Amino acid sequence: MENDAGEFVDLYCPRKCSASNRIIHAKDHASIQLSIAEVVPATGRMTENTKSYALCGAIRRMGESDDCIVRLTKKDGILTKNF
């Protein structure tokens, strides 16, 4: 689709589930997106960096969302490996 300036724009940019790599469609009202902030361990203050995770409704319906969040944050180094 084109806007008034003649540039091509998308109406909807689909997200992908961070755990299952499925595309989250527009009518998936059970899907969530979490943004976890990085914290400086010495001061306990939040930095400018955040990490976003999107989970589809199918993962949440199966009750696997907490396990997926732990697995993804361990992989990214937010949680320690022995958590």
From Swiss-Prot:
Localization, UniProt: Cytoplasm, Cytosol; Cytoplasm; Rough endoplasmic reticulum
Transcription regulation recorded as keyword: no
GO biological process, alphabetically ordered: translation
Main location: cytoplasm
Example GO molecular function: structural constituent of ribosome
Any one cellular-component term (Gene Ontology): cytosol
Keywords: Cytoplasm, Endoplasmic reticulum, Ribonucleoprotein, Ribosomal protein
InterPro entries in UniProt: Ribosomal_eS21, Ribosomal_eS21_CS, Ribosomal_eS21_sf
PANTHER family, per the entry: 40S RIBOSOMAL PROTEIN S21
Complex formation: Component of the 40S small ribosomal subunit.
Family as reported in the entry's similarity comment: Belongs to the eukaryotic ribosomal protein eS21 family.
Protein name: Small ribosomal subunit protein eS21
Organism whose genome encodes this protein: Agriotes lineatus (Lined click beetle)
Gene: RpS21
